[in-house]
Amino acid sequence: MMVIGSIFFRRRVSPAFVVTLAFLFLVLRSVADDQITKKDGTNITGTILGVSGDQVSVESHASSGGTVKGLYYISDIKSISMATPAEVTKVQAQGVEPAAVIAALEPQVKKFSGLPADWVVQAMAQLAQTYAAQGQADRAVAIYNQIDTLYPGSKYHAQAVAGKAELSFKAGKIDEALAAVQPIVDQANKDIAPSPSDGATYASAFLVYGKVLEAKKKPQQALEAYLTVKTMFYQNPNLVDQADQLAKNLRDHNPGIGIE
């Protein structure tokens, strides 16, 4: 019996077994880590700690077994793969108290704003929308301006445009809001397979578009805009919930309305 146990023990700690375990550990660790690909093709794996100025701070695993921190210029980064923090995900659903949204998103936005990752800009936009809903339009505008400043000439500009258009609509500037979102709506109608981030931006624009159409007494077209968010640009659950509620309210006030 002891011989069998001894053989079993030796097999468990054989070099091949140890190598296999080490390989599995590295695979699992790499899956959990954030990934940065630089424009020169270099890959950095580790944990993104935050943004300071024009650099990203990353904690990586050293070959010695410890960790090492490095700074990388944002301008040198081609792409980033980073899971959305749980603090952000939990407040994306409709119905979360504004105070909870602000408490969850403010630290994340402060820590990661400027990072070229979709979830960061979406969190900034949601934070701005929450401020606007609380009557703090100046803080909302400041965040949208920050998006334009931190991501000049990027795809995220449309997110800021849609956000400012929402504020224009709330201020009663209907035509100004329409003029702002119309180019985004036109682009969305041409985009057959939008990315998740583009889908979220289009959803924001279509929500404003629908509200403008409602204000212009075009309920059928407004309903179509809301349903487009639900069926085509459904990547952000919070925006889908908003579209669903707007469509429901519209139907309640316009019995028998439908899409041709």
Question: Which residues make up each language-model segment?
Answer:
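Bacterial N-terminal signal peptides
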Residues: 16-27
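N-terminal low-complexity, intrinsically disordered tails enriched in Ser/Pro/Gly
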Residues: 199-200, 211
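N-terminal secretory signal peptides that target proteins for export/translocation
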Residues: 1-12
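Short acidic/polar micro-motifs centered on Gly/Asp/Asn
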Residues: 129-132, 210-214
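Helix-start (N-cap) detector for alpha-helical repeat units in TPR-like alpha-solenoids
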Residues: 121, 155-158, 203, 237
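Terminal, low-structured helical/coil segments at or just beyond the last alpha-helical repeat
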Residues: 219-260
